[in-house]
Amino acid sequence: MDDVIIIGGGPAGLFASFYSGLRGMRVRIIDIQDKLGGKMHVYPEKIIWDIGGLAPKPCFEVIQDTVKQGLHFEPEVNLEERVIDIRKIEQQHFEVETDKGNVFSSKSVIIAIGGGIINPKQLDIKDAERYKLTNLHYVVQSLKKFKDKHVLISGAGNSALDWANDLSGYAKSVTLIYRKADIKGYEVMKEKLEQLNVKKLPNTHIHQLIGDETQTQIEQVILENIETGEHTVKSFDDVIISHGFDRENTLLEQSSAKVDMFNEYSIKGFGNTATSIDGLYACGDIIYHEAKAHLIASAFSDAANAANLAKLYIEPKAKAEGYVSSHNEIFKESNKVVMKKYL
């Protein structure tokens, strides 16, 4: 039996894993994705500024650091596995069931699933699916990939504007289309867009994708003006779709362990990450409490609190908090490795 099962492998779940390990608990992380890091993979090249004491760095480096830290105490990790039920059997005994038929037993559970499972909204037109592996994109993983390319972006939200702004410095041309007359992003982003060489086509959407001879890549796009019905054929090297995300929270809706909810996507909790069920805690964006700040930095605080409560739930006589890392003997050998860089 595990001491704690952490559902979710984003920044909150990873720090909960680290801190639970620091507190001597046996940990298992379960995540539906094929890699750890959570939603941070949506914006890997964005610069993260708001983690206290950490110099600005690209998100992919933050991912690397949080994953390395989260795995420091060698937790069990189950990837590409969806949790479909949480059951509280008795005091200090939970069962966590997954879509692979596994039923894991644990003394406590920490839910760290962010805003739930998110999936980019797909382009709903004929043959769109066949181009997903080539030049139809729903996430920008690397700006350099679009260097000297003619790029079409469909969308009017902040992500679409953000990508248009960033890609204008790499791509040969950027065309932004949106269905309404106006863009709905933040004013500062719209103002920045006006200063860049980005072609904007309002009242426009993608009518059809035209493939190359192999029918594996998009070669041209038929654009339709929604007001006039006029069609225009244009050539593009890459097409980016930014129509928002579909969110699902079926785990909390269908779980046998019914926690109190703040709204459809947030658990109602307390500043110490406790929920309405003893032994079940939540950290990161999935929990709402009065002191909540939706930052990666605050997810770390949530995670430490959740791990501390899990420890006290399992061992009521344990210390309320873990011993600080700077003076903790558990890091004695690891510190020697770290210090070699500075000697």
Swiss-Prot record:
Record-listed E.C. numbers: 1.18.1.2
Cofactors, names only: FAD
Binding sites annotated in the UniProt record for FAD: D31, K39, Y43, V83, I118, D285, S326
Transport in keyword set: no
Main EC class the enzyme belongs to: oxidoreductase
Entry keywords, A to Z: FAD, Flavoprotein, NADP, Oxidoreductase
Highest rank taxon of the organism: Bacteria
Alphabetical list of Pfam families matching this protein: Pyr_redox_2
InterPro entries assigned to the protein according to its UniProt record, in alphabetical order: FAD/NAD-bd_sf, FAD/NAD-binding_dom, Fd--NADP_Rdtase_type_2, Ferredoxin-NADP_redctase_2
Single annotated GO MF: ferredoxin-NADP+ reductase activity
SUBUNIT field: Homodimer.
Family: Belongs to the ferredoxin--NADP reductase type 2 family.
Name of this protein: Ferredoxin--NADP reductase
Organism expressing this protein natively: Staphylococcus saprophyticus subsp. saprophyticus (strain ATCC 15305 / DSM 20229 / NCIMB 8711 / NCTC 7292 / S-41)
